[in-house]
Amino acid sequence: MEDVNQEKKKVPPMSEPERSTPIKTTGGQYRFCKSCVEGSSCRTVRSRTKLMNVLIERGRPHEAQTVFKTLAETGHRPSLISYTTLLAAMTVQKQYGSISSIVSEVEQSGTKLDSIFFNAVINAFSESGNMEDAVQALLKMKELGLNPTTSTYNTLIKGYGIAGKPERSSELLDLMLEEGNVDVGPNIRTFNVLVQAWCKKKKVEEAWEVVKKMEECGVRPDTVTYNTIATCYVQKGETVRAESEVVEKMVMKEKAKPNGRTCGIVVGGYCREGRVRDGLRFVRRMKEMRVEANLVVFNSLINGFVEVMDRDGIDEVLTLMKECNVKADVITYSTVMNAWSSAGYMEKAAQVFKEMVKAGVKPDAHAYSILAKGYVRAKEPKKAEELLETLIVESRPNVVIFTTVISGWCSNGSMDDAMRVFNKMCKFGVSPNIKTFETLMWGYLEVKQPWKAEEVLQMMRGCGVKPENSTFLLLAEAWRVAGLTDESNKAINALKCKDIEIAKLEKLYQKQSSGSSFNLLQIPVGKRELPTAKAMNLSACKLGARVPIICQKQSQAQFGISGQFVHSCTVFLS
């Protein structure tokens, strides 16, 4: 209602300089909006400002900026609400550099400022951590006779927390309490923001002091309050205290009961600490309290049991999911499938894949890549390529699965097949990356055809992919393995980075050459059981720190997957 009243206020008429600058319309005519020139409320400005708010709410703040620009371009003058909304759009996008200029523009226009505008300014500065300018805005606000609200102080408290100064946040709370003004009294958000500020610095005891003061002021801590402190304990590696000190208090509170978020915080903490059994125990405890874990929680448990090679634990989680009527998605299937695949149990992995399709869950490129990678490890590149063909028909394969299949043929020494898949990749419109080219170069190294590796390097440049130091080192090794030392030295000399310790690298090559082969993928050895996270990762190319098949993002995603599992999944673990 306050916004509506603000919009109806008479806007100052355009100044003489503004009047003297005509605006060209799409029809080629020059005009001004009569309402804007006279300082009256303009319907167009109101409607476009409303549109800006809608765009921000829908997560499209950049479009809100564009709408704002069209106001002036079409002969309209933005209102104070327009500028306030623009500030909100800039803040969401973290474009803090223009805040001061926007404030100056509004002040120069002669528009009468209000507390809503100043709150937006203070919020923008606070979000950026620029508390000096945020405080200056507060002082200017008071100079103009505008009273700060509880929201104003909450924003400043949050800002000092962002700036890593919770002590100043506490001082502001004390100031609010000392003033005794009902209009600016602390509320639940005030205290929660301050708790968050202390927890950000991992000062749990200070956070508990805020909770104590909160209760003394007659404000009841809520679930957000306790979840924030629980998160702090988890980040400190003290998940046991999160359960014993935080959750126990929540259980006793009427209006701050544990929820799904609480469950996720504690279970995630136990899993990160390697105490997956405690995580499973906690989920069962929450189930008894009718707080059911969500998909993320269950998948964290599955992933945790995979890392500690506990197949019985995985089975227990899947059974519990069935009891909770939680269904699987592609990520959960991928987690279990990856465990079997990495351990070398390709029949089990393929069975999980079939069950996923049977359950109506559509495999994504990552799921296909996991299975293809397993076949490559098992020296079955033909099956890996069959998966690729299926993916081409049903979806769109990415560079990862193409490179995985190429590496499979390279591992078998079938370079004609590797190049055939490479050409298919290009024909399909998937751009090869440096890992693709280095995989081919490694393949030619294995079959002792360094001149072919040289051709791949030229092809790489032709595709606009810039070679890296590892590329030249790979080429040098290809020539060296073929017994052509002079050509190897030429490749090393082509390195642009002169600070590389060539002697150390050559020593590394000598050590690696003592092995039977230059393996691109690490084949599981020893006991055929669920591997640890490290064992499940593809090994780096032997020439250096490069993972040839899986990009960093996907490699991380393998062990940070979240999701859920179907009722029939337990059969795969028997």
UniProtKB/Swiss-Prot annotation:
Biased composition (Basic and acidic residues): 1-21
Keyword presence, Repeat: yes
SUPFAM superfamilies: TPR-like
PPR repeats: 44-78, 79-113, 114-148, 149-183, 187-221, 222-258, 259-293, 294-328, 329-363, 364-394, 398-432, 433-467
Residue span of region Disordered: 1-25
Keyword presence, Repeat: yes
Signal peptide residues on this chain, from the entry's feature table: none
PROSITE patterns given in the database record: PPR
Keywords, ordered alphabetically: Repeat
PANTHER family reported for this sequence: OS01G0228400 PROTEIN, PPR CONTAINING PLANT-LIKE PROTEIN
Family: Belongs to the PPR family. P subfamily.
NCBIfam families named among the record's database cross-references: PPR
Entry protein name: Pentatricopeptide repeat-containing protein At5g25630
